[in-house]
Amino acid sequence: MNVEMRGLHLLLLSVLAAAPVAGQEARDTLDVFFVGNSYIYFNNLPGLVEGISEKLDGPHLKTASHTHGGHRLSEHLSDGHLPSALQSDGSMSQTWDFVVLQEQSALATVTDTVTGELGSPVEFQRAVHDLASQVRNLGATPALYMTWAKRRWPAQLTDISAAYRGVGAELDAPVAPVGEAWAAVSTRRPDLELFVADGSHPNPAGSYLAACVMYATLTGRSPVGAPREVWGQPWNGAGPMESDTPALLVSLTAADAAFLQEVAWEVVNHAEAR
């Protein structure tokens, strides 16, 4: 085989290798960037979302994040790091389909004189509006990650839900109703723990629920059938860690995983029907 024919042969092989297998369609990909704090990096939520999407028939979600423990959205605005983070992630094309915004804990609500929880709905609304404007200037769609009530104060959810839904409506931005799904699980399966010991942060089951809600919200598809075990980038108290070796992020029983998937889909569907 001469050099010219050999080159043509190799080109043909590369084209065939890249083509979808008969009976299979190429999958769409959504690039999703998460902005927030430890409620995102605990159990590597972006990695869970990505891992769940890999095993389902819908779009594949490729994720990245910019997080700091305890950070408010207003601090992400003021520290000046977010614009460069959004435009300089080397693993993707620097274009995002969605940028998910997560406010600090219950900051979206008014300060609670009973619980002592500090809230600043005006700060929350201003920060979300400013960040959403930046996100849209980059050609992406802002999405809101509704947080949950802490274990000791479940009544917080009413104000949290109203705050996220209100600003979501103002911005015409999708709201991932994680807090509402959390409350539904706590009511229907109080034996299924979603918190770590501090009663605030998510354990692996809590993050798995959040990932199912996020997947359903961003894709419009059901997370039912997602794997009960998800592997991904390991994480520690500062966020995801650089590693060539994937870690087991969550391992649930088949029954618990199916229940969380079903609740996530029910809550997202109910929210969209409002």
Regions found by a protein language model. Give the residues of each.
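Short alpha-helical patches at coil-to-helix transitions and adjacent helical residues
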Residues: 42, 204-211
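Conserved catalytic region of serine esterases and O-acyltransferases that act on ester linkages
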Residues: 28, 201, 211-274
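Conserved SGNH/GDSL esterase-like catalytic core that processes O-acyl groups on lipids
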Residues: 30-33, 39-123, 270
